[in-house]
């Protein structure tokens, strides 16, 4: 009740245009909460004064404690972000209006919190109205990671990993903690400057190998461990084929199926079989691990997979969506093992069109677990691939033919392959980055990618064709999860156009009617452009984000009208659900009740929403880990010079990307050859004396002057040329 009463007191004060006497404040609070007595209200008023939440003026009237200016009585709500200086910016809900919040007016709000705020009666600066937070509606997160540091006086301090976190942390219990421990803690309560927290988990010592990566994992809300009950249930699962499964599944054991994955892969969820039927047609069979057979609905295994949503692939580890006995053993299509699978068979003509398709549950055997390196060496003539059978080698050559056919069709349809460089961070045995290489995407990688795209399209069309008949019995809409990708927004394309002009990159201007092949044609028209890699990256930034949805709106980037994610159920929850839908509505509908089907259909919207959130978290975690390792790597190269390309120009500096994909900032103060003015109209910096222009696409030589692993920031200075 006291927290609610405190909130009521601050709300009453906030709505007053002038300072309010304590007696009138108490009266208004009692009108809102009649069950209180006046003494309790006055006690809480005194407590709020002590906490500096409210302030008593010389005339004994009360105001919000931290406000030095008069404020508008209208209370607004929005999401707050905080910059590196500690100041806030609130985007008002349901509007595009943004407000500036000086750090002294944050009132305990942390980044991405939902807050109530009031405008201050103060002259706007930089077109932003000043505001002050008066209430925290909801925290974006309550779990944080920090380092436990002991002090000479016997006390301690929690150095929080998040550089934007400014509250002083007091732990309820420090038992077992030693200097240097990295910990996960949960905030229980807070004031504007302090917080009481409970210890959730000791991650390890800061000097432990991998504790840096684990700290980022926990800070992003990912649990790298499984509940013992989940592990126990998973450990009891084993491969078996009962009479019903034997009857309902087709045996494709005689097919010489192979898998092609990165070296060392342990969670193999897809395998391929290719056969050239004649000069006009190819047979393509894609077999996918049948995770849904083992992970049944309404089990703790399924609940945990739903909560995680995806596996997370990091520089030094994989955090799986499912326990290892499932992801690396009974569901992984390991060489020489019989496995449950769902297979998508297709016949594809010489133009890349899928002429026939069938999707069904099966039992398979992986005859050879191949690596991308092995297959690429075979294709490039570097290896005779002696360990593969003659049949396998013939199949690989036919698969390569089919890959080119499928790729040419997708390009003709408008598929855009941005071919963005991906970094591969090499660590030593202590987890220190010793090299940054570029991940090579060769024929084998692109071939498997094209085969999986074909399977995802075929399964979507198959489901729509076969579910329609079943659904008439249940009066349900098409229950499915699609992977969709909207066309880029006009605003984003207009921003890209500004950059394109500066780089002399020619594009058409009909943004309203943009089609997938519009963008591929832009790249074709400029295929010899010196800055094509940078342009591809800028263009990719302007694209919409792909997502999981229950309504099919097509996939713009793949130039596909029908697309889902079917091929990775070991590591993606939506794929598992697509398999489950196939079982419930097509493969074995008589084994499920209408109630079970309706229950799953009603949950699909929630599944897509949570899967989208979990995907964002996983991607952010991967980027955060890479950024930390980049900074750690560059810290070993302070003072060294590198060649890079300007990727962004702003009022505070210039971002430069090196050939190894590492990006750093040249702050304005580190452009020492001149004083520069920022020209916002064309996003350039112009030297006042020498009139030198710095713009996107410039090739520059930089020197590393600072790299901070914790903030994940790298600073360069421009080397005179």
From Swiss-Prot:
Family according to the record: Belongs to the RNR ribonuclease family. RNase R subfamily.
Biological role: 3'-5' exoribonuclease that releases 5'-nucleoside monophosphates and is involved in maturation of structured RNAs.
Pfam families cross-referenced by the UniProt entry: CSD2 (PF17876), RNB (PF00773), S1 (PF00575)
Location of the RNB domain: 249-587
Lineage: Bacteria, Bacillati, Mycoplasmatota, Mycoplasmoidales, Mycoplasmoidaceae
Reactions catalysed, as given in the entry: Exonucleolytic cleavage in the 3'- to 5'-direction to yield nucleoside 5'-phosphates
Main enzyme class: hydrolase
Gene name in the database record: rnr
Localization per record: Cytoplasm
Major localization class: cytoplasm
Known EC number: 3.1.13.1
SMART domains linked: RNB, S1
GO biological process: mRNA catabolic process
Keyword Magnesium recorded: no
GO molecular function: exoribonuclease II activity; RNA binding
UniProt name for this protein: Ribonuclease R
GO cellular component terms listed in the entry, alphabetical order: cytosol
S1 motif domain boundaries: 639-719
Entry keywords, A to Z: Cytoplasm, Exonuclease, Hydrolase, Nuclease, RNA-binding
CDD domains for this protein: S1_RNase_R (cd04471)
């Amino acid at each position: 009740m006291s927290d609610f009463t405190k909130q009521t007191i601050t709300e009453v004060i906030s709505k007053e245009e002038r300072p309010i006497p304590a007696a009138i404040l108490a009266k208004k609070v009692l009108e809102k909460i009649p069950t209180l007595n006046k003494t309790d209200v006055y006690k809480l008023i005194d407590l709020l004064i002590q906490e500096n939440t409210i302030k008593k003026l010389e005339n004994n009237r009360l105001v919000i404690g931290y406000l030095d200016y008069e404020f508008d009585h209208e209370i607004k709500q929005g999401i707050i972000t905080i910059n590196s200086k500690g100041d806030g910016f609130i985007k008002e809900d349901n509007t595009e209006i943004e407000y500036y919040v000086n750090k002294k007016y944050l009132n305990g709000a942390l980044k991405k919190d939902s807050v109530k705020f009031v405008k201050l009666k103060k002259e706007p600066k930089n077109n932003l109205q000043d505001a002050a937070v008066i209430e925290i509606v909801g925290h974006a997160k309550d779990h944080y990671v920090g380092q436990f540091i002991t002090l000479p006086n016997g006390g301690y301090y929690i150095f929080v990993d998040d550089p934007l976190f400014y509250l002083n942390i007091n732990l309820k219990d420090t038992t077992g903690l030693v200097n240097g421990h990295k910990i996960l803690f949960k905030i229980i309560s807070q004031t504007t400057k302090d917080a009481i927290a409970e210890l959730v988990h000791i991650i390890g010592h800061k000097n432990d190998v991998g504790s840096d990566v684990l700290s980022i994992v926990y800070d992003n809300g990912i649990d790298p461990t499984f509940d013992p009950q989940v592990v126990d249930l998973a450990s009891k699962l084993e491969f078996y084929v009962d009479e019903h499964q034997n009857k309902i599944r087709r045996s494709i054991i005689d097919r010489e199926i192979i898998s092609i994955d990165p070296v060392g892969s342990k969670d193999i969820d897809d395998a391929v079989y290719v056969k050239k039927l004649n000069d006009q047609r190819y047979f393509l069979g894609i077999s996918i691990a049948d995770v849904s057979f083992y992970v049944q609905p309404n089990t703790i295994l399924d609940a945990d997979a739903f909560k995680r949503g995806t596996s997370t692939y990091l520089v030094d580890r994989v955090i799986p969506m499912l326990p290892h006995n499932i992801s690396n053993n009974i569901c992984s299509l390991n060489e020489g093992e019989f496995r449950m699978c769902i297979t998508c068979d297709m016949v594809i003509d010489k133009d890349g069109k899928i002429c026939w398709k069938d999707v069904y549950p099966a039992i398979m055997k992986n005859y050879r677990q191949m690596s991308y390196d092995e297959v690429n060496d075979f294709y490039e003539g570097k290896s005779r691939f002696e360990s593969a059978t003659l049949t396998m080698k013939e199949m690989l050559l036919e698969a390569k033919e089919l890959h080119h056919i499928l790729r040419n069709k997708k390009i003709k349809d408008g598929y855009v392959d941005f071919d963005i460089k991906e970094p591969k961070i090499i660590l030593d045995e202590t987890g220190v980055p010793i090299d940054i290489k570029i991940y090579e995407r060769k024929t084998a990688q692109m071939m498997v990618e094209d085969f999986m795209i074909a399977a995802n399209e075929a399964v979507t069309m198959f489901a729509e064709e076969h579910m329609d008949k079943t659904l008439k019995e249940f009066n349900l809409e098409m229950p499915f999860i699609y992977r969709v990708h909207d066309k880029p927004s006009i605003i984003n394309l207009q921003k890209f156009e500004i950059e394109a002009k500066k780089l002399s990159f020619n594009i058409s201007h009909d943004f309203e009617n943009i089609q997938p092949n519009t963008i591929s044609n832009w790249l074709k028209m400029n295929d010899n452009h010196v800055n094509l890699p940078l342009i591809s990256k800028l263009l990719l930034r302007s694209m919409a984000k792909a997502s999981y949805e229950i309504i099919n709106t097509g996939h713009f980037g793949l130039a596909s009208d029908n697309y889902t994610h079917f091929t990775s159920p070991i590591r993606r929850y939506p794929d598992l659900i697509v398999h489950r839908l196939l079982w419930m509505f097509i493969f074995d509908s008589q084994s499920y009740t209408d109630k079970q089907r309706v229950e799953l259909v009603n949950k699909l919207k929630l599944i897509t929403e949570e899967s989208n959130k979990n995907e964002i978290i996983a991607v952010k975690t991967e980027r955060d880990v890479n950024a930390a390792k980049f900074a750690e790597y560059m810290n070993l190269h302070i003072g060294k010079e590198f060649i890079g390309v300007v990727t962004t120009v702003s009022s505070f500096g210039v971002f430069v990307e090196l050939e190894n994909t590492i990006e750093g900032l040249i702050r304005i103060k580190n452009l020492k050859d001149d004083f520069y003015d920022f020209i916002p109209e064309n996003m350039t910096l112009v030297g006042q004396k020498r009139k030198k222009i710095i713009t996107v696409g410039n090739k520059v030589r930089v020197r590393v002057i600072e790299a901070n692993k914790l903030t994940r920031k790298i600073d360069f200075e421009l080397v005179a040329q």
